[in-house]
């Protein structure tokens, strides 16, 4: 069921993976550390409609008006190795709403990373999802 929900929001946007066109992503360790801190502090949402709560461009812009690029980066599990620093295209796989971790955001990250064969990010999202589930029970 979670896979169907995630697919509803992820697949139409991304389309099928084309490995020759994919950017190279690395795991953003600072984002993982922040997500762990938020989970341990119980700053999470267990059931949300990620397609509705995922930050839109206007919300990202508003966040950047009051925060640094480093703060923005901490909400993204992936770093696009081909993009310039301090550009939105540098950061991918957002997992929260700039306040809390969303379980459905982690599921979407894991699903999308698996679909696009970004194994390290897929595993990082999986580990965070397991941590959240363990903490919330």
Regions found by a protein language model. Give the residues of each.
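A charge-rich, low-complexity, intrinsically flexible signal that marks solvent-exposed coils, linkers
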Residues: 20-137
């Amino acid at each position: 069921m979670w896979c169907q929900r995630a697919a509803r929001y992820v697949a139409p946007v991304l389309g099928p993976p084309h490995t020759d066109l994919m950017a190279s992503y690395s795991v953003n360790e600072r984002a993982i550390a922040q997500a762990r801190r938020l989970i341990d502090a119980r700053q999470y949402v267990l059931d949300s409609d990620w397609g509705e709560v995922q930050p839109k461009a206007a919300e990202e812009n508003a966040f950047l008006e009051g925060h640094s690029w480093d703060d923005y980066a901490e909400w993204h599990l992936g770093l696009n190795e081909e993009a310039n620093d301090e550009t939105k295209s540098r950061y991918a796989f957002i997992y929260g709403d700039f306040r809390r971790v969303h379980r459905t955001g982690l599921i979407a990250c894991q699903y999308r990373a698996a679909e696009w064969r970004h194994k390290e990010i897929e595993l990082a999202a999986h580990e965070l999802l397991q941590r959240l589930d363990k903490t919330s029970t």
